């Protein structure tokens, strides 16, 4: 069994790390490079960087900080934000990214997933999915352009259909960003994760809702996810990564040791 991964997420806007609640009202957390170094030293297994307004602004991720990150950390990192072409991806890999993640551009053109996977290998291509639970209908919908709350829109895709589609197109990993839970710190949506796990053959990463160490444990044990991504609990120093890993080991969860 592969070891479970702990993944701090750094949302980037205008060159700084920010964090919102349910993808809204973002506050500045700090500078990118020192935070990346801090999490790498704390024992993170990998890092994810989202240039959150790149897609909605019609641009690609700001590459200047990608190269700086690659120079100062020695753990894998994934970069997302407005990647629409093979050339966009090539530049990010050249600057040192280990993986790229696509979200809104994949919804606009699902063949992008296949083209990227064919060129760089499925192991390097992550698809991010921003899901919203609609209380009235009990359905999970996929949203697009969520980095800018004024442009966020619901797509015609229901969650499980899109999960199946991106796998057929060549996604090597899926990060499920559960928007209803984002930033609330009251736990991952285990019911949603279990539904997705049932149709997901590739590594599945939970995102949105971590507030306590037990939330990570529950996602790994109950929903059988491969990794857990979190932001505010790490940014606000509510949970320290080393302590979290020790806790998970005591819960009989296989974790990558330092």
UniProtKB/Swiss-Prot annotation:
GO biological process, one term: L-histidine biosynthetic process
Subcellular location(s) per record: Cytoplasm
Enzyme class: lyase
Keyword line: Amino-acid biosynthesis, Cytoplasm, Histidine biosynthesis, Lyase
MF terms (GO), sorted A to Z: imidazoleglycerol-phosphate synthase activity; lyase activity
InterPro entries noted in UniProt: Aldolase_TIM, His_biosynth, HisF, IGPS_HisA/HisF, RibuloseP-bd_barrel
Annotated GO CC locations: cytoplasm
Residues of the active site: 11, 130
EC number: 4.3.2.10
Pathway of action: Amino-acid biosynthesis; L-histidine biosynthesis; L-histidine from 5-phospho-alpha-D-ribose 1-diphosphate: step 5/9
Matching Gene3D superfamilies: Aldolase class I
Catalytic activity from the UniProt record: 5-[(5-phospho-1-deoxy-D-ribulos-1-ylimino)methylamino]-1-(5-phospho-beta-D-ribosyl)imidazole-4-carboxamide + L-glutamine = D-erythro-1-(imidazol-4-yl)glycerol 3-phosphate + 5-amino-1-(5-phospho-beta-D-ribosyl)imidazole-4-carboxamide + L-glutamate + H(+)
Assembly: Heterodimer of HisH and HisF.
Protein family according to the UniProt entry: Belongs to the HisA/HisF family.
Function: IGPS catalyzes the conversion of PRFAR and glutamine to IGP, AICAR and glutamate. The HisF subunit catalyzes the cyclization activity that produces IGP and AICAR from PRFAR using the ammonia provided by the HisH subunit.
Name used for this protein in its record: Imidazole glycerol phosphate synthase subunit HisF
Species of the source: Haemophilus influenzae (strain PittEE)
């Amino acid at each position: 069994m592969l070891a479970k991964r702990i993944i701090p997420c750094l949302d980037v806007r205008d060159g700084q790390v920010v964090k919102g609640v349910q993808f809204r009202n973002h506050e500045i957390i700090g500078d990118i490079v020192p935070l990346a170094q801090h999490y790498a030293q704390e024992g993170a297994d990998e890092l994810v960087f989202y240039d959150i307004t790149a897609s909605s602004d019609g641009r690609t991720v700001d590459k200047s900080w990608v190269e700086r990150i690659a120079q100062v950390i020695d753990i894998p990192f994934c970069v997302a934000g407005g990647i629409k072409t093979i050339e966009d991806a090539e530049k990010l890999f050249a600057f040192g990214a280990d993986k790229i993640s696509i979200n809104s551009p994949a919804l606009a053109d699902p063949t992008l997933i296949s083209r990227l996977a064919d060129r760089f290998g499925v192991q390097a291509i992550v698809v991010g999915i921003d899901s919203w639970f609609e209380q009235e209908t009990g359905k999970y919908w996929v949203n697009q352009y969520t980095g800018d709350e004024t442009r966020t829109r619901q797509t015609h895709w229901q969650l499980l259909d899109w999960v199946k589609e991106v796998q057929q197109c060549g996604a090597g990993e899926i990060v499920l960003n559960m928007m209803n839970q984002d930033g609330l710190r009251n736990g991952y949506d285990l019911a949603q994760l279990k539904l997705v796990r049932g149709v997901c053959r590739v590594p599945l990463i939970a995102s949105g809702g971590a507030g306590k160490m037990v939330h990570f444990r529950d996602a790994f044990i109950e929903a059988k996810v491969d990794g857990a991504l979190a932001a505010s609990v790490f940014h606000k120093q509510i949970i320290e990564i080393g302590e979290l890993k020790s806790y998970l080991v005591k819960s009989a969860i296989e974790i990558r040791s330092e």
